[in-house]
Amino acid sequence: MKQYLQVTKPGIIFGNLISVIGGFLLASKGSLDVPLFILTMAGVSLVVASGCVFNNYIDRDIDCIMERTKNRALVKGLIAPGVSLWYATALGIAGIALLYFAANPLAALLAVLGFIVYVGVYSLYMKRHSVYGTLVGSLSGAAPPVIGYCAVSGQFDSGALILLAIFSLWQMPHSYAIAIFRFKDYQAANIPVLPVVKGIPVAKLHITLYILAFMVPTLMLFLGGYAGYKYLVVATAVSVWWLGMALSGYKAAVDDSLWARKLFMFSIVTITCLSVMMSVDFQPEAEPAVLVSMLP
């Protein structure tokens, strides 16, 4: 049974749940619906797990080439490919059904869209054929906090849009950092990530620009009245520090692999801090502009 847990990538599920909590509690504004919270977390976990299993199935031919993925269950034959497809399908159906019936149709729809982008667009095609695969994948990576938010609100409003911008822009430097310190793996597997296609100096520039872009929606969460001054202080501090770390990569004597690994680790600190602060420093009086509503 251990291999069936590992193939769902528990670390990725856990990381996504942190962002789900942030979005859910931000929308709750201090009024926590515990059953809805638990069921939303479970639903998102199942959908993310499904996407990860499908990704493992799709990537099994290149996972055997890459050092960090060569011991995955499907590569080593611990799970039959056909069984993994049934397993992934069951997880996905269960997760989407749970979000639909326990939360609302909008939360389920967002989960479906995120799943399609990750599995159908990114994993099946963009990852192997385009340098823009990371950009497309970032949209699916930003879905969980938006699902958490919309599970409460029942509508896609300006707050949900800001969350989508924050988490999708965060994904870019986070992912490029991985591609730099895992450069040889991606090169060996012929995956066209930016550092491999355009070079590490170009990737460093993109990382810096994306962090600058990321800082804008993080501030919008405060300026839009969704989060308070404590959030602002923490968000500003971690964003500026992250930017400083990115700029340190331009030093002549820098070890690119070590620098990228540190940048990657701090990206996790950054998004965790933001998720925690938007959970605890929400503004009850926030009145977002409604973009899409599925509530009667």
From Swiss-Prot:
Sequence intervals crossing the membrane: 7-27, 34-54, 73-93, 106-125, 131-151, 161-181, 207-227, 232-252, 263-283
GO biological process: heme O biosynthetic process
HAMAP family assigned: CyoE_CtaB
GO molecular function, one term: protoheme IX farnesyltransferase activity
Record Pfam families: UbiA
Family membership: Belongs to the UbiA prenyltransferase family. Protoheme IX farnesyltransferase subfamily.
InterPro entries for this protein: Protohaem_IX_farnesylTrfase (IPR006369), UbiA_prenyltransferase (IPR000537), UbiA_prenylTrfase_CS (IPR030470), UbiA_sf (IPR044878)
Keywords: Cell inner membrane, Cell membrane, Heme biosynthesis, Membrane, Transferase, Transmembrane, Transmembrane helix
Keyword Ligase: no
Name under which the protein is recorded: Protoheme IX farnesyltransferase
Keyword Transferase assigned: yes
Annotated GO CC locations: plasma membrane
Catalytic activity: heme b + (2E,6E)-farnesyl diphosphate + H2O = Fe(II)-heme o + diphosphate
Pathway where this protein functions: Porphyrin-containing compound metabolism; heme O biosynthesis; heme O from protoheme: step 1/1
Name of the encoding gene: cyoE
Localization per record: Cell inner membrane
Organism of provenance: Aeromonas hydrophila subsp. hydrophila (strain ATCC 7966 / DSM 30187 / BCRC 13018 / CCUG 14551 / JCM 1027 / KCTC 2358 / NCIMB 9240 / NCTC 8049)
Function: Converts heme B (protoheme IX) to heme O by substitution of the vinyl group on carbon 2 of heme B porphyrin ring with a hydroxyethyl farnesyl side group.
Something else known: Carbon 2 of the heme B porphyrin ring is defined according to the Fischer nomenclature.
Membrane topology value: Multi-pass membrane protein
EC number: 2.5.1.141
